[in-house]
Amino acid sequence: MAYSTVQRVALASGLVLALSLLLPKAFLSRGKRQEPPPTPEGKLGRFPPMMHHHQAPSDGQTPGARFQRSHLAEAFAKAKGSGGGAGGGGSGRGLMGQIIPIYGFGIFLYILYILFKLSKGKTTAEDGKCYTAMPGNTHRKITSFELAQLQEKLKETEAAMEKLINRVGPNGESRAQTVTSDQEKRLLHQLREITRVMKEGKFIDRFSPEKEAEEAPYMEDWEGYPEETYPIYDLSDCIKRRQETILVDYPDPKELSAEEIAERMGMIEEEESDHLGWESLPTDPRAQEDNSVTSCDPKPETCSCCFHEDEDPAVLAENAGFSADSYPEQEETTKEEWSQDFKDEGLGISTDKAYTGSMLRKRNPQGLE
């Protein structure tokens, strides 16, 4: 099984790291081992302590003194051996603890550098290679090298097509049978694929028709969107069916209210009654005397002479002429007064109605008389 360069570098780095971690532990564990304590001088060290204990009475010394000597000798030997071993182990441990981290960090940096160089070389090699255009990835940009390769293939296919045409020639009916239709189809398919890829490579950076249509300014002869996008509504029916506006009665500030009109009418009637009262008085002294007599005497006595005088046709004619002369003057004065009052007060009553009203009111006293 052949390993690639990346796999080899990774394997070597793993081995180095494993060794850098395991070797210091081995060295440190070996330094911790202590050497056996040295035996005391004489033959006492060859025998076990029980033998010393049994042989003690043979000498001329007491057993307590011998036990103390042997104990001191062993303690001295242990202290001496442990002191020397500890000093050597401590110095070795400190040196390895300083070297190993630096060594491991340097190895790690070296591995990273190798991986970086390999990745960079791989990318440059991939740029130099020629890849065929995949049918699914149509929007991929084509490099200049790929474009040159496609142009060469296009030239080769054109040369092959020219050779086929030359073979056919004028007597091509017999030679055309030698060339199969499959080869022609294959060549045509290759030619179409190459031309398609070249067009995609040339026009890939251009805008799409949709973007060009969006960014293009509106021309003067642009007629707008078709009718399907925005329907045209006929508003004639709505205008015909629209109901007429209803005006709400709002009082005109210039017009008088009903109460004010009633008050003015009452005042006008009072003034008219006053005028009629003054005008109804007769100017003839006879009439004044008659009125005074009638006013003084509620029940006057009727005599035959007065009755005959009233029924006299001459008297009646004089009275009729006097009344006819006085009526035009009264009518003119009342007409002017009525027209002036109604103009000032804004009433819509015509002067003819006022004239007829005055005539009726003026003739009533005459009828009563």
Swiss-Prot record:
Task: Please name the GO terms that the record assigns under molecular function.
Answer: acetylcholine receptor binding; protein folding chaperone
List, as start-end ranges, the regions of compositional bias called Basic residues: 360-369
Q: Which residues form a coiled coil?
A: 140-169
| Pfam families referenced in this protein's UniProt entry, alphabetically | RIC3
Cross-link type Glycyl lysine isopeptide (Lys-Gly) (interchain with G-Cter in ubiquitin), residue numbers:
202
Q: Which GO terms describe its cellular component?
A: endoplasmic reticulum membrane; Golgi membrane; intracellular membrane-bounded organelle; neuron projection; neuronal cell body; synapse
- Span-the-membrane segments of this chain are 96-116
Outcome of mutating residue 346 to V, per the record?
In a colorectal cancer sample; somatic mutation
The record's account of tissue expression is: Broadly expressed, with high levels in muscle, brain, heart, pancreas and testis. In the central nervous system, highest levels are detected in the cerebellum and pituitary gland. Over-expressed in brains from patients with bipolar disease or schizophrenia. Isoform 5 is predominantly expressed in the brain.
Mapped to this chain, the residue ranges on the Cytoplasmic side of the membrane are: 117-369
- Chain positions with N6-acetyllysine modification: 202
The family line of this record is:
Belongs to the ric-3 family.
Task: Describe, as the record does, how this protein assembles with itself and its partners.
Answer: Monomer and homodimer. Interacts with CHRNA7, CHRNA3, CHRNA4, CHRNB2, CHRNB4 and HTR3A.
Its biological function? Molecular chaperone which facilitates proper subunit assembly and surface trafficking of alpha-7 (CHRNA7) and alpha-8 (CHRNA8) nicotinic acetylcholine receptors. May also promote functional expression of homomeric serotoninergic 5-HT3 receptors, and of heteromeric acetylcholine receptors alpha-3/beta-2, alpha-3/beta-4, alpha-4/beta-2 and alpha-4/beta-4.
| Record protein name field | Protein RIC-3
Q: Which organism is it from?
A: Homo sapiens
